A protein has these predicted regions:
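Charged docking surfaces used in two-component/phosphorelay signaling
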Residues: 15-23
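Alpha4 helix (beta4-alpha4-beta5 surface) of REC/receiver domains from two-component response regulators
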Residues: 62, 75, 82-101, 107-111
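Active-site residues of response regulator receiver
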Residues: 52, 80
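Conserved acidic carboxylate
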Residues: 8
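Receiver (REC) domain active-site loop signature in two-component systems and cognate sites
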Residues: 55
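Acidic, metal-coordinating helix/loop segments flanking the phosphotransfer/catalytic sites
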Residues: 5, 29-48, 69
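Acidic catalytic/metal-coordinating carboxylates
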Residues: 33-36, 59-63
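Receiver (REC) domain switch/output surface
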Residues: 109-121
Length: 127
């Protein structure tokens, strides 16, 4: 089980993803914007940040950069529905960040998250 912070501004997508990740055995906290997500990263340790790239206030790329400074070792996965934004996230995101383009299958999301978490072990030191 991993601790995942989900930052997604679309309410239905956020609820859908959160529910799917909990069913996959992960502990999930979710927020609807980058600023709230950053505050939560400062207060708690997470294994993975799953962030939409396009959000109000602070986009997912800036959130990921700041999250990596606050919590070195956090893994980052971006989700986006825009091809150009996906390329930007891949080029400007933290080292090792992955990009998953919408639409995607939940199996694909869970498989990619599990693969990321297996690379080094949980960032928080918990299993």
């Amino acid at each position: 089980m991993a601790r995942i912070l989900l930052a997604e501004d679309d309410d239905s997508m956020r609820a859908f993803l959160s529910k799917a990740l909990v069913r996959a055995g992960h502990e999930v906290e979710d927020v609807d914007n980058g600023l709230d997500a950053l505050a939560m990263i400062s207060d708690s340790g997470y294994d993975l940040l799953l962030a939409d790239v396009v959000m109000p206030g602070m986009d997912g790329i800036e959130l990921a950069r700041r999250a990596a400074k606050e919590q070195p070792g956090i893994r980052v996965m971006f989700i986006t529905g825009f091809a150009a934004v996906a390329l930007k996230a891949r080029d400007q995101g933290p080292t090792g960040a992955r990009v998953l383009s919408k639409p995607f299958h939940l199996r694909e999301l869970v498989a990619q998250i599990d693969a990321m978490l297996q690379t080094v072990g949980p960032a928080t030191g918990k299993t």
